[in-house]
Amino acid sequence: MSFVANPKIDPKSLGKVGVLYGGRSAEREISLMSGSGVLAALQSRGVDAHGFDPATQSVAELAAAGFDRVFIALHGRYGEDGTMQGLLEQLGVPYTGSGVLASALAMDKQATKRLWMTHDLSTPRFAMLYADTDFDAVVADLGLPLIVKPAREGSSIGLSKVTDASQMREAFEKAAALDNDVIAETFIDGAELTCPLVGEGATAEALPVIRIVAPDSNYDYQNKYFTDDTQYLCPSGLSAEVEREVQQLAVQAYRVLGCRGWARADVMLRADGKPFLLEMNTSPGMTGHSLVPMAARAAGISYEDFVMQVVAAATLDLHPNEHWKPE
């Protein structure tokens, strides 16, 4: 595995590290929790690390901060969607995780699913919803239950499970309050799984799969972050063959999107054993309830060791020519 226990990383080699957290998305609260954990981990290893909140500090302050690299612990819009990545490209500051295009693609569930379908990767059938959509026709085509959610939000924010056609309008309006694009996808009845990933391209690898057992099968925002009632099984309890199949599917999905550094694929395992990709998170949570640190621990990698390796892999899409000058 490219990520290991006890990596030999000199904290001085990382230079001055900025941890971007908070931000302006609906996931701000979770980002603050993730970033605080990352910041503490880096500082505990002797890294010159500093927190930076783009919601309260300006671009000029970011440019003047003198960061040699940054750990992006932002979730959702303005941090996980390619916008912050593009800014850091302009500033020439290496950053963790996927680049501009992969981040933007993964943030948009519609674009992600279309790309996966093009590569014959299994993902639930879906339809885009608008105010003038014939919801009855969507239900007739996709069947019930349906999952209705904003195309560009995370942490289950704005998500509804529709079990009757009469619920479609309310579910649409809930999601549309957060995003102009709303997606309805076929509900997959089965086991909820997640698979963290590290590396890039040919070196991309999957960490152990985690099985999620939420109260009443409702893994919503509250049950993700603020209760202890949700069970996380790692080892997952899946057979070695099924776990390997889920990991291989997740790696393919990661590569197709062009992800790098680290990410987390959410997967549903249907009762007949067929896995379906739901979405790719390119800036996963790093809170006390988060899943990537749990999978890393199962692979023998501590939270601090994992963070050190993520930040050591910080890079840019484009590497500026230091000798270039405008004519």
Swiss-Prot record:
UniProt binding sites for ATP: 139-194
Catalytic reaction(s) noted: 2 D-alanine + ATP = D-alanyl-D-alanine + ADP + phosphate + H(+)
Cofactor requirement: Mg(2+); Mn(2+)
EC number: 6.3.2.4
GO cellular component, as recorded: cytosol
Record key words, sorted: ATP-binding, Cell shape, Cell wall biogenesis/degradation, Cytoplasm, Ligase, Magnesium, Manganese, Metal-binding, Nucleotide-binding, Peptidoglycan synthesis
Family annotation (InterPro entries): ATP-grasp (IPR011761), ATP_grasp_subdomain_1 (IPR013815), D-Ala_lig_Van_CS (IPR000291), D_ala_D_ala (IPR005905), Dala_Dala_lig_C (IPR011095), Dala_Dala_lig_N (IPR011127), PreATP-grasp_dom_sf (IPR016185)
Residues the entry annotates as binding Mg(2+) 1: D266, E279
Compartmental location: Cytoplasm
Binding site for Mg(2+) 2: E279, N281
Cofactor note: Binds 2 magnesium or manganese ions per subunit.
Keyword Metal-binding: yes
Pathway(s) annotated for this protein in UniProt: Cell wall biogenesis; peptidoglycan biosynthesis
Pfam families from the UniProt entry: Dala_Dala_lig_C (PF07478), Dala_Dala_lig_N (PF01820)
Family: Belongs to the D-alanine--D-alanine ligase family.
PANTHER family listed in its UniProt record: D-ALANINE--D-ALANINE LIGASE, D-ALANINE--D-ALANINE LIGASE B
NCBIfam families: D_ala_D_alaTIGR, PRK01372.1
Name of the protein in its database record: D-alanine--D-alanine ligase
